[in-house]
Amino acid sequence: NYRSWRMAEIVRLCEQMGVPKPIVCQPYYNAMNRMPEVEVLPACQHYGLGVVPYSPLARGVLTGKYDPKVKPGKGTRAGRGDQRIMETEFRKESLIMAQKIKVHAEKRGMSAGVFATLWVLNNKIVTSVLAGPRTVAHWNGYLEALDYEFSPEDEALIDKLVAMGHPSTPGYSDPQ
């Protein structure tokens, strides 16, 4: 989780010291958080770093399991009051967006989670995703994304919901 200027400085210092530079960057990147597209992903491409984003499902929000009109279930991160999700992804705008993605994905015959993973993997700069399944079913959902092709209509949907380089909520900044 480094800003692009820090990545450049790390690469410069590694070259100066004659040691291997980093080989991968793990940004927080998904369809609700497109901020890395502005500087981080281009820096990775420039310096030849692999990109393995974490939280492609936005801590589960992009699965569409949270209805913005319904209190989250007790067995969910939001239902347990998990601080990370409550301070980040669990915002009305994101929940509404996730429901729109869910409807679109289901029309294509896939789950919203598969769609969200596929969206991240569709970025040519991305090497892989850092998956965090809690169950075998979750793991299979990540793998299922490899069975689909991303369409121009899919990309247009995400571009309509979240502008390139921005988060799902205008002016939002992840409190890392």
Segments the model singles out, each with a brief description of its role:
Residues 1, 26, 116, 130-131:
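Short beta-strand segments
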Residues 1-35, 39, 50:
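Glycine/proline-rich, positively charged
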Residues 3, 29-33, 55-62, 119, ...:
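Glycine-rich beta-alpha junction loops
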Residues 14-21, 107-109, 149-150:
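Short helix-capping segments at alpha-helix termini
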Residues 25, 44, 51-54, 101, ...:
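Conserved, mostly hydrophobic/aromatic
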Residues 36-76, 111:
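Aromatic-lined glycan-binding groove of carbohydrate-active enzymes
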Residues 46, 74-103, 107, 122-127, ...:
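Terminal-tail/helix-coil boundary detector
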Residues 109-117:
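Short catalytic/ligand-gating loop segments at beta-alpha or beta-beta junctions
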